[in-house]
Regions:
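Radical SAM enzyme [4Fe-4S]-AdoMet core and its adjacent flexible, acidic
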Residues: 8-146
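Acidic helix N-cap motif at the loop->helix transition within catalytic regions
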Residues: 5
Length: 146
């Protein structure tokens, strides 16, 4: 998909300053479960293409990952995926209730009442080395509250 876009719209790519991609999982199983109709092989092919184009066109590349019950265990893995594909940042975003999920409270691990909240907090501690303690941190957590 992205290769086709790149070949059809060179002006956009040549003037691109930033590109964000939302990805719901760092594994085939999680990605295809959460992104209905999504294909793990296809997203990886697109990420590889973006990575190569980034080298040539020098735009910022950001991976967005909305953290929830079914993928929070892959927070560290999505950071590694971001590094693999030369992302400038990996944003771990809090899931918000936009009244589109019937089971939001079940998915919302940010709630202290959620049975997996403590495990989420422990996993968040494991990714602290990526959160600005290095010269060039890869991870930003603009909306997550521990």
């Amino acid at each position: 998909m992205f290769k086709e876009f790149h070949s059809r719209v060179p002006y956009v790519i040549n003037n691109l300053q930033e590109l964000g991609v939302s990805i719901d999982g760092a594994s085939k199983e999680t990605y295809e479960k959460l992104r209905l109709g999504g294909k793990w092989d296809k997203i990886n092919e697109n990420l590889e293409c973006i990575s190569k184009m980034k080298e040539k066109h020098n735009f910022r590349f950001i991976l967005h990952f909305v953290v929830q019950k079914d993928n929070y265990h892959e927070m560290e893995d999505i950071i590694q995926l971001g590094k693999q594909y030369n992302a400038d940042r990996v944003w771990l975003n809090k899931m918000e209730d936009w009244n589109v999920f019937d089971n939001f409270s079940d998915m919302n691990i940010f709630s202290p009442e959620h049975p997996l909240h403590k495990d989420y907090q422990q996993r968040l501690q494991k990714i602290k080395p990526y959160l600005g303690f290095e010269k060039n941190p890869i991870v930003e957590i603009p909306t997550l509250n521990t």
